Amino acid sequence: KQAPARVQELEEWGAVFDRTSEGLISQRNFGGHRYPRLAHVGDRTGLEIIRTLQDFCVHQGIATHMECTGLDLVLDGNKVSGLVGYWRETGRFILFKTKAIILATGGGGKAWKVTSNSWEYTGDGLGMAYRAGAELIDMEFTQFHPTGMVSPPSVRGILVTEGVRGDGGILLNSEGERFMFNYIPEKFANETADTEAEAQRWLDGDREARRPPELLTRDVVARAIKTEVEAGRGSPNGGAFLDIASRRPADFIKKKLPSMYHQFKELAVIDITKEPMEVGPTLHYFMGGIRVDSDSQQTNIPGLFACGECAGGMHGANRLGGNSLSDLLVFGKLAGGGAKQYVNNLTNTINCNDVDVSRILTNATDILNRDEGKNPYLVHEELQDIMQNNVGIVRTAEELQIGLGKLDSLKADIENVYAHASPQYNPGWNEALDLKNLIITAEAVTRAAILREESRGAHTRIDFEGEREEGLSYNIIIKKTDSSMTAEKISREDPPQELVDIAHASLKELEGE
């Protein structure tokens, strides 16, 4: 409900969205959507949002601490009172004394070997919140985007936007077959085209036609590509072919997909206006995260708030394409409002606990003071192998339990990582510090995946195929108890009647309203 207002706000602050010939904001199709909803700026909407917000911060005089990384939260009793961080450039520590903190740190995709996430996505917010006593929720739901680059190896996993398929791109196997017609789930059959002719009519704007199968939800498309590869029908580098060159003129592609055109030109020496791309599934997004109140975005720790990808519960079991941007805009504003209200209602003085601060500093510098230890890069690679092989797109109890055992064994190595003694410009130290959050993130996902014995949304258990009715009645919560992690099911509250009516309404009933 609040997303349109946030888009208008961005425009007032200087964002320039694509327009229709009538002057309205252009909205495009993405996977899982029945209608073109996504306001966009070519295929670089996220960059435009970042640019706009950065400019706004500068003009408002908001302090920004570049290359400053959070280490841990400081508590006064059970309330947030500060955060200890460090400057990557100098290695110097900094203590932020504050009455409230909003975490907006993204997910933990770097726990997997193949991911669209950049180097920052190491579960920092998840780890800090968990250690402070906050609960995590829905961690089993990790989204694998169906289209990441697969070649060359140095760029494997980098995102290929869903906009390629939204603008007409099709998926082909090594035999030239448009295979997504073979993978339409029964629950989506009534709204998905089952012939190429109908799919083309939909692309041409026929409201009576159903959407192409390439625009099914991301979990469906990712599993389909994986199945084709395992059946021996994959592309040479273990993916599928994404072809828009044969579907759209070169000028259209360069105008609507400029980032993708340059990305493949520079990184893979491929001209997407002339030849297909090779793509494959890549870990992309966490539906799970820190458990928050839906209105204020506050956690169970007073003064700690979270929004965006690091907050859980917004997207259920499966996020629709494009909703992450509207999510962070809408719930970012709610988090700001919640934090302001919390601070205004505080009556007691908040103090930083010196013992907490000293402990955080000691844990960080111990890595530099060792004479020897484990190589943090090799430990990270081992963690990524575990998650890629045991907690992937499809899961079984046996593989998950093996993965959990390996993660448990890896904890000793993480506690004994070593980096060169100088804290200045020390990426090895940065990597070692990140591992403390990555192992928490990886273990939380694995434990939750073991406990959910069904296949729902982005969580697929091939030993428990299909959804179970019971699965709708609970969420899985991750808690810190003493020095160990526990996962437990908690009953969900009854949703508002309005949402119940929507969930059980037919497509025709919804369109008639």
Protein language model features and the residues they cover:
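Glycine-rich loop(s) and the adjacent beta-strand/alpha-helix scaffold that form part
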Residues: A100-I158, N190, N318-G338
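Glycine- and aromatic-enriched mobile tails/lids
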Residues: E9, A15-A39, D76, R165, ...
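Conserved redox-cofactor binding core of oxidoreductases
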Residues: R6-R92, K97, A104, G148-P152
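An anion/pyrophosphate-binding glycine-rich loop and adjacent beta-alpha core
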Residues: E135-E266, G338-N344, H380, D385
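Fold-independent oxyanion-binding glycine-rich loops
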Residues: W13, T20-S21, V41-D43, E67-T69, ...
